[in-house]
Design a protein with these regions (language model features):
Chain B
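N-terminal regions of ATP-driven nucleic-acid and macromolecular assemblies
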Residues: 1-175
Length: 655, 175
């Protein structure tokens, strides 16, 4: 049974695809109970009588992460669970209240989406040959009621152009005739509600869903890794996969293969997997695994950290280890990178909420993360020669990155802050151990960030081997012919701003305009052009010889600047708020959007061009006609300074 | 056992007090009262405590617990068996858990029958007001005296007085 989509509506609907590509709906009656534990059931006997009479409550025992509990199974919904909480003055412990029922059904049945061989869930070799259709809409969804220019690619490419109502009606016709299993559509989640309003008004049937039904996800703004993100409301069709190619992080990073892999692991429909963050995916994966193993999932996160002495807390809560680099240019440098360091630590050191008190028990987190870690090792290796594994590898990388942060997340079902701290404590020990080891073997340690170490010296293969032996973790090596560690404003080395030439002839760049999404195109492409020239230099001697050529790129860009197309100067920002107490360019941009009738929400991305920086005057990208030349010249100069440092800094050679 | 916040303002065992005060007043009250070392002290704060890095208490009787959800806060209060329970208010805990304001307030009141319970915030907000409704006393100390040393440093850096007014020019500019 190859499941393409899953929905819970008075039972579970599985949309299954057969070998011929026909998709049909299978309905299963399913009404799982949630579980209730009371410290003193006799104190709530009246409530239990009602639950027994009206909600089929029955005494039972069930397994939590920390062991077996006696309690009751109750057939009811979340609302009932919340009433029980109120009634018991929040003494009740509830489980399996908010697990997605379609996911729970599949976990219990041992099936998963996008695959039909039960043994292949952790395999990177699965079919992605779905009938797909790409819909590229040229219009701006924030400013136009209906699209007027659309390119549709199925078996062939068609362009639809004309009045909105005609284009949308034609698009509906194409979806119906091609009948794709997967639709990849730009800004799908913004367009679909508009299409629905149009279809209701004109009496048309919107053909994205196979049975005319849509699930609704509401819009929200949320904090993720220190920045505000915004998710549009979404209409999700039944029986067909619809991916918003602009908004889906998983699709952007991992492509369709990444979305399908996320769905296979998490047990969520690809429609949901495409719309969730890696953090939600890893948590869904843990929930699927818990249900599969017969462990109930807590409804509320009520178990707080244990009481600690202040000194213990200060010692434990210190995060990752850093070694600050000395800014400069270095030749023959090796970057040793621990593959999936934090998840590997969880697995190797058996770190899980329940093993903190009972270290000899086999931990839930290590058990469920181990197959993902080994799958990541495999895809990381295979993508070097087979690019089709790159999307899956990236998805796994993100899921594993977030699995660590998730242990400390306040609402993590299977997280606990002490586990988070134990992981970082181990990582600090490992990085220090590795540094000491490298230095004892005659290497010079230049820089270190959490799970990476930059060293000069040889033989690096022996060092790698020794690191593996001592730490039990695998360290990958990338060799730089030369690398530039940039300075901070105060002259000390920046942790995360560097670039260099790898021995395969490519450049690795971090933290400068060429890699920053917020930098204007004109500056990003200027720096990329410079780096392409620098990439031809195999050592610092050759690098010095391309200086004039690189400088010419800068001077030419400066000269062209006054005549540049304003759209190439757009600055992208993800806004964290919509009200600003101080005057700033970002605040002016938010106001400019509003003046043009575009509603903004925290987490949304905006693009603006600076018309007059001193007066805080900016224009949205679509309105810009002029720009502040001196302001952009200063941005260009900053970008040049990052590059020019490679020609002026001190060269450090090994030994 | 009591904590002296200001002359004439003391907090005693067997009460639940809601206190609004400048941070330096509270840290001074916690750091400069050696008698507190003799009692079991539980300091409760969220993920972004403004006080904890300024507390110089190292006694083994001084313990910290950090709830990151309102449900965890309720558990922490219910499990506390300390003589002094000090809660640094974190409004973010209640952003999606307003349902717990009343039970948490009641748990603080209940704990205040046996212990000295302090709910502290530097300024009033809606969750604090809801929790403080069940307090025996609401104490607000307004910063009229000497400024917080940290505030003073920030003012010096920004070229303003600690009260926010611009500093007068003290040297002549040389062209």
């Amino acid at each position: 049974m190859w499941v393409l989509d899953t929905v819970y509506r008075d039972g579970v609907d599985l949309w299954c695809r057969d070998a011929s590509g026909t998709v049909t709906r299978k309905h299963y009656a399913y009404d799982p109970p949630f579980y209730l534990h009371l410290a003193d059931p006799s104190a709530h006997h009246e409530m239990l009588d009602v639950l027994e009479a009206e909600f089929k409550a029955e005494p039972c025992s069930f397994f939590t992460l920390f062991g077996e509990l006696d309690g009751f199974s109750v057939h009811g919904n979340r609302q009932l669970a919340e009433q029980i909480e109120q009634q018991t003055r929040f003494d009740a412990r509830l489980f399996n209240v908010d697990v997605r029922r379609d996911q729970q059904f599949m976990a219990e049945q041992g099936i998963f989406p996008c695959g039909d061989d039960p043994g292949s869930r952790f395999s990177a070799d699965f079919s992605c040959s779905l009938r797909r259709m790409e819909i590229c809409i040229r219009d701006d969804p924030a400013r136009t009621p209906l699209c007027t220019e659309v390119e549709v690619t199925g078996d062939c490419t068609e362009t639809l152009h004309g009045p909105g109502h005609t284009v949308v009606a034609d698009l509906f016709g194409l979806v119906e005739s091609i009948d794709p299993e997967v639709i990849l559509m730009s800004h799908a989640d913004t367009w679909l509600p508009k299409f629905r309003a149009f279809s209701v008004e004109k009496g048309l049937t919107m053909p994205f869903s196979r049975n005319g039904k849509y699930r609704q996800m509401s819009s929200r703004s949320y904090w993720s890794y220190g920045r505000m993100e915004h998710k549009e409301a979404a209409l999700i069709p039944d029986g067909r996969v619809l991916i918003d190619t602009d908004e889906s992080f998983v699709y952007r990073e991992g492509g369709l293969a990444g979305v399908l892999m996320a769905s296979r692991l998490s047990g969520l429909s690809p429609n949901m997997a495409a719309r969730f963050t890696p953090g939600t995916l890893i948590s869904s994966y843990e929930v699927y695994e818990a249900v599969k193993r017969g462990i109930v999932v807590p409804f509320r996160k009520a178990d707080a950290e244990t009481a600690r002495k202040l000194a213990d807390l200060r010692a434990a809560d210190r995060g990752g280890m850093m070694f600050q680099p000395k800014p400069g240019i270095y030749e023959n440098v090796n970057e040793l990178d621990f593959t999936s360091m934090y998840p590997s630590i969880i697995v190797r050191y058996n770190l899980s909420p329940e093993t903190l008190e009972n270290p000899s028990a086999k931990g839930f987190l290590p058990a469920v993360l181990a197959p993902v870690v080994s799958l990541r090792r495999e895809t990381k290796e295979r993508k070097r020669t087979e690019p089709r594994y790159a999307g899956i590898d990236t998805l796994l990388k993100w899921m594993l990155v977030t699995c660590f942060g998730y242990t400390g997340y306040k609402n993590a079902k299977f997280g606990r802050i002490e586990v988070h701290e134990a992981i970082t404590a181990r990582s600090r020990d490992i990085l220090i151990q590795t540094k000491d080891l490298a230095e004892s073997m005659g290497f010079v340690v230049l820089h270190g960030i959490v799970d990476c170490l930059w060293v000069q010296g040889s033989p690096v293969e022996v060092l790698q081997q020794r690191i593996g032996d001592v730490t039990g973790l695998r360290a990958e090596n990338e060799h730089f012919d030369w690398i530039v560690f940039l300075p901070l404003n105060d002259g000390f080395g920046a942790y995360n701003r560097y670039y260099g030439r790898l021995s395969d002839g490519s450049m690795k760049v971090r933290g400068i305009a060429a890699r920053r999404h917020d930098a204007p195109d004109i500056i990003r492409s200027m720096q990329q052009e410079m780096l392409e020239v620098m990439c031809t230099a195999k050592d610092t001697g050759e690098l010095a010889r391309v200086r004039d050529k690189v400088r010419k790129i800068y001077l030419a860009a400066l000269q062209r600047l006054p005549l540049a197309d304003p759209r190439t100067l757009a600055i992208s920002r993800r806004i964290s708020r919509t009200r600003y107490t101080h005057r700033c360019l970002e605040g002016a941009a938010v106001q400019a959007y509003r003046d043009d009738g575009v509603e903004v929400a925290p987490g949304m991305k905006i693009r603006y061009i600076v018309r007059d920086a001193r007066r805080y005057q900016v224009d949205p990208e679509w309105r810009a006609k002029t720009f502040d030349v001196p302001y952009y010249r200063s941005l260009m100069e900053k970008a040049w300074n990052d590059i020019a440092y490679a020609f002026g800094g001190r060269v450090m050679r090994p030994g | 056992m009591q904590i002296r916040l200001r002359p004439g303002i003391t907090l005693r065992v067997g009460t639940f007090s809601a206190v609004i005060a400048p941070e330096h007043v509270i840290t001074a009250a916690l750091n400069e009262n050696p008698e507190l070392e003799r009692f079991l002290f539980l300091f409760v704060c969220g993920n972004y405590s403004r006080l904890i890095s300024h507390i110089g208490r190292t006694a083994s009787s001084f313990e910290v617990r950090r709830p990151f959800t309102a449900d965890q806060l309720l558990t922490v209060i219910r499990e506390a068996a300390h003589t002094i329970i000090f809660i640094e208010h974190d409004p973010s805990l209640f952003e999606t858990a307003e349902r717990l304001l009343e039970p948490v307030g009641s748990a603080l009141k209940e704990a205040g029958r046996e212990a000295l319970v302090v709910l502290y915030a530097p300024s009033m907000d809606r969750p604090f007001a809801a929790l403080a409704r069940q307090a025996d006393r609401l104490i607000e100390i307004v910063n009229t005296g000497e400024p917080d040393p940290r505030q003073r440093m920030a003012a010096v850096r920004s070229g303003h007085r600690a009260d926010g007014r611009p500093q007068a020019q003290t040297t002549l500019e040389v062209q």
